[in-house]
Amino acid sequence: MCGIIGMIGNTSVVPSILEGLRRLEYRGYDSAGIAVLNQGTTDRRRAAGKIAKLENELRKKPLDGNTGIGHTRWATHGVPNVVNAHPHVSGSVSVVHNGIIENHKQLREELVSFGFAMETETDTEVVAHLVKYYHDRGLTPEKIMRAIIDRLSGAYALVIMIADYPGMLMAARKSSPLAIGFGNNAMFVGSDALALAPMTRRISYLEDGDWTIINRDSLTIYNSKNVQVERPVSLTAVSGALIGKGKYRHFMDKEIHEQPEVIGYTLSAFYDPNSNYMKMPEVAFNPGLLPKLTIVAAGTSYYAGMIAKYWLEGLARLPVEVDIASEFRYRNSVLPDGGAALFISQSGESLDTLMALRHARERGQHIISLINVDESTIARESDVVLKTLAGPEISVASTKAYTTQLAALLCLSVDWAQKRKFLDKKKVFEIMDELSRLPTALAEVLADKERWNACAHELAGARDVIYLGRGLNFPTALEGALKLKELSYIHAEGYAAGEMKHGPIALLDEGMPVVMVAPYDEWFDKTASNLKEALARGGRVVLLSDKEGIERLDDKPAWVFEMPKVNPMVSPILYALPVQLLAYYIALEKGTDVDQPRNLAKSVTVE
């Protein structure tokens, strides 16, 4: 969602804050702004749209100051425009904020009764006025922080700057991440280590409920009980270099093409092919005695969890339940004593998933996480962390993070199946050998660029698209539909192929695209019947199958993409690639913003 950066230095902080904002672009945003302290006054520039527009404002009216804050906003309260862009200012007070202040309406009414004039629709402006209210009454920075934290309900990361205190920033976090950076004669605060990496590698993470007073040469942290504490300082492994697109047109294109390599990296972390040995992290329980595993995730990661259910139940004979993170806490699910919960999140900061994790911990579950960012809140609050080696994923729509999640989940399933005595060494080798060959098959699919382009050209004018799959590839159909919606803004729905006759078939008419994910497996003949039904009603079928499946069809669709033959167990990883490619090329045809689709954010840090 929003991105925050703040800095105290002994030279102009504007270039460094701009660099930090650029590195936060991947989170998604619709406006940006910077405020600095200059000779005892606050100076601010804001712009709707991309950071390039903010840079244009800064060229016209430069900023200079040794203390400053910056922000990229993704609208929640108030439309995306300059007026609602952060930082928000009230007199000498400037505030940037990520999250949602749930009681902002009550606070707004109270502040208006005190004479404050509201200029925006945002909840953040309320915070700025609240800080000014306490500042005007002579409270010290420490007392101001205690007072506002007592008044605010909801989730937030806040950085506050007061002109009367040059060289000082105040910050607080509740269910939204903040990191502190230590530089040479400089201090930093930001949403994550990625934003701070160009300036410093020395990072300290605030824990939930922490608040802090930051000066150029000192830092004081208090916990949620207002007790002064220290938080460990570590050297971040995040690169300070700004990640580029290289030879690719978009980050998504680059990340799609990186999948053969990063899946290989992830496999090497969990499996040694020379000894046929699984290298999964040790857990504090016996997988053989585990009564149930609950998998919790959101968006694309939820579909990875659905596929993992097939693997864990089929291979390890382990009861698995898969929950949407935003629903998990609200249905009083049955979590047995000694059970475990696995939380999947690319960023490790998805707030729905984080809150679900805390709920599961309160219910006595062993906590495992599968993340791509090890310096993340979910990772720090887990008992065991499985790390995908996808590298930074910048495009909002997930590609390589998803397929590396699947690779890691299949490794976990094989490992636990072996520990639960349902797989012998020979069967482990068969599955893992097939998985190890997968990068070669993925590279083969990537070589067919021209036909994907041609198919996308024909489908780009569609109003609606249906995706169908069975068994392990039912979630692939769901993921394909999600990718198309995210990137091209075409309405798409994914269904289990066997459900077509139970409603979705009513949508079929002449020319409607139907994407069928149908490797030749035990379910193929039934899926082929669905294909015939779609063709009989004039549907434009796009078939994704292997040579054996294609040869068994009497009626050939207009578009047939022959996929490499793989073991059905690993097919969801392979078949993720064509649905990504189809969505990408259709988005190119439609001219949408592939890397930052409208209204979407990379890291969803509000509920």
Task: Give the positions of each predicted feature.
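Conserved short alpha-helical segments that host acidic/polar catalytic motifs at enzyme active sites
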Residues: M1-K245, R249, E258-P291, Y303, ...
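Glycine-rich oxoanion-binding loops at beta->alpha junctions
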Residues: G49, N66-V83, A269-F285, A308-I344, ...
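Acidic/histidine-rich
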Residues: L152-A186, A460-E486, D521, A528
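Glycine-rich, anion-gripping cofactor-binding loops and their flanking helix/strand elements
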Residues: A179-R201, S326-R361, E499-E533, V566-Q580, ...
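Extended hydrophobic-aromatic, low-complexity segments
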Residues: G181, A304-G305, E321-V322, L351-L354, ...
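Active-site phosphate/pyrophosphate-binding segments
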Residues: Q259-I263, L267-T294, V384-P513, A587-E607
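Glycine-rich phosphate-binding loops that contact phosphosugars or nucleotide phosphates
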Residues: G288-R437, V517-E522, K526-F561, L582
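Generic C-terminus detector
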Residues: R540, V566-E607
